[in-house]
Amino acid sequence: MFEVLPLFKSHYSIGKSILTLGSAGSSEETGPDSIIDICSAAKLDHFYLVDDSMTGFMEAYHNASDAGIDLRFGLRLSICNDISLKEKNSNLFEYKCILFCKNKAGYERLLQISSFASTEGFYYNPRIDYK
């Protein structure tokens, strides 16, 4: 049978979501909703957070843990043929991929990949290749 995956993007993916990673009970009636509050209200034991950077991971991890909810984090990356190509049309052939970490070692590897993409591969946005 099919399972619905509780998948969210947070406000750290600038302009793509009004959901925050605030702690349980931080949502306001006239303000943005907390992903943690949504998951708590729906009695979810886990949720998937996919963002374009690692910026909100620790906030999400601590607030989800405090609420007794398991966080499954994914980093959305741009993949190109060659990060050394930084020419006018080189970003036309990029595609997106989501990498999930399942433990601390995976989290540390995502940090390395994200850092590399932001420093070595940056051309309009962080990117990686298969080299």
Predicted ranges, named:
Residues M1-K131:
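Phosphodiester-processing cores and adjacent nucleic acid-binding clamps
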